[in-house]
Each structure stands twice: as C-alpha cells, then as structure tokens.
C-alpha cells in the first residue's frame, strides 16, 4: 500500500512541476549559417500529401520502380514468379538457381 501511495505522490509532484515550468523561449537552430538544419522544412513536410511523397521517392532513387510506389499494388501477383520476371511465360524454380550469398547457400571458403 505504501508503494502505491509513493507512486501516486511522485506522479502528482511531476505533474505540478510540469505545469509550473514556463518554457516561453524559442528553440534555436544548432547549425552553421542556417543551412542543413534539422527540422527547417517541417511546415512543408506536413503539407505534402502522400502522392507528392511517392513522386519524390520515384524521382530521387533509381532502384525503386514506380509500380512499387503505387497504392495497393502487388508487383507480381502470379504464384511462383519472381518480381523481376513477372511478365515472362516460363516459371522460376527457386531450387534450380545458382548458389550465391543472397540465397544463403554460399559458403565463404578461405
């Protein structure tokens, strides 16, 4: 019972201290000449919709396809096909592929 009262008393003190603190000073930027500051474009980021964000991602990085950025889209819905060869007619067999580090069968022999 004493631990509960101590916890409640501590939370009450914490709430009173938080209420009494007056933080009216502005937050300053800690960067050189105001360039590259963290959070300098927070207003613009909150105004952008999701389509704008997707277009910026598609434009900036070349290894993400635009189809991957579309909403509710599976790159290849055909079973057994890889994402890279989805439109080809032949079926990919994952057990007949070559051995490499990415397929976790590659052994690092010294």
From Swiss-Prot:
Pfam families given in the database record: RALF (PF05498)
Keywords: Disulfide bond, Hormone, Secreted, Signal
Superkingdom of origin: Eukaryota
Disulfide bonds listed in the record: 76-86, 99-105
Site (Required for proteolytic cleavage): 54-55
Function, in words: Cell signaling peptide that may regulate plant stress, growth, and development. Mediates a rapid alkalinization of extracellular space by mediating a transient increase in the cytoplasmic Ca(2+) concentration leading to a calcium-dependent signaling events through a cell surface receptor and a concomitant activation of some intracellular mitogen-activated protein kinases.
Protein name: Protein RALF-like 4
Species per Swiss-Prot/TrEMBL record: Arabidopsis thaliana (Mouse-ear cress)
């Amino acid at each position: 019972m004493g631990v509960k009262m101590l916890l409640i008393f501590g939370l009450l003190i914490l709430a009173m201290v938080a209420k009494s603190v007056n933080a009216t000073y502005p937050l300053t930027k800690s960067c050189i000449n105001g360039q590259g500051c963290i959070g300098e474009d927070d207003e613009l980021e909150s105004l952008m919709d999701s389509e704008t964000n997707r277009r910026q991602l598609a434009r900036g990085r070349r290894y993400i396809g635009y189809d991957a950025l579309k909403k509710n889209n599976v790159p290849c819905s055909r079973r057994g096909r890889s994402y890279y060869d989805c439109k080809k007619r032949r079926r990919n067999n994952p057990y007949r592929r070559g051995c490499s580090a990415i397929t976790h069968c590659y052994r690092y022999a010294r």
